[in-house]
UniProtKB/Swiss-Prot annotation:
Pathway: Amino-acid biosynthesis; L-histidine biosynthesis; L-histidine from 5-phospho-alpha-D-ribose 1-diphosphate: step 2/9. CDD domains: NTP-PPase_HisE (cd11547). HAMAP family: HisE. It is found in: Cytoplasm. The keyword Nucleotide-binding applies. One of its GO terms (cellular component) is cytoplasm. Keywords: Amino-acid biosynthesis, ATP-binding, Cytoplasm, Histidine biosynthesis, Hydrolase, Nucleotide-binding. This is Phosphoribosyl-ATP pyrophosphatase. InterPro entries: HisE, PRib-ATP_PPHydrolase-like. Its EC number is 3.6.1.31. Gene3D superfamilies: MazG-like. It comes from Mycobacterium marinum (strain ATCC BAA-535 / M).
Length: 93
């Protein structure tokens, strides 16, 4: 897969989110999400998964890609909240 220089990878996002979790910058939506807890994060993952499904059924590929990116974001925030590493997930693929 060829990427442009402006593209953020799955690993880049995970590193960025992990950094926010460690440094806790004021006003960070990621920090607020982490502080909300696993229950809230899990509900957000379910919501985004539903939006991915609906976009796949009824919207453009661009809209679908946006919904998938949001699902990946929330899944990674949940992973960080629980202390699950990318390697742990990759071993299950």
């Amino acid at each position: 897969m060829k990427q442009s220089l402006a593209v953020k990878t799955f690993e880049d996002l995970f590193a960025e989110l992990g950094d926010r979790a460690r440094t806790r910058p004021p006003g960070s939506a990621t920090v607020a999400a982490l502080d909300a807890g696993v229950h809230t994060l899990g509900k957000k993952v379910l919501e985004e998964a539903g939006e991915v499904w609906l976009a796949a059924e009824h919207e453009s590929n661009e809209a679908l890609a946006e919904e998938i990116s949001q699902l990946l974001y929330w899944t990674q925030v949940l992973m960080i909240s629980r202390g699950v590493s990318l390697d742990e997930v990759y071993r299950k693929l």
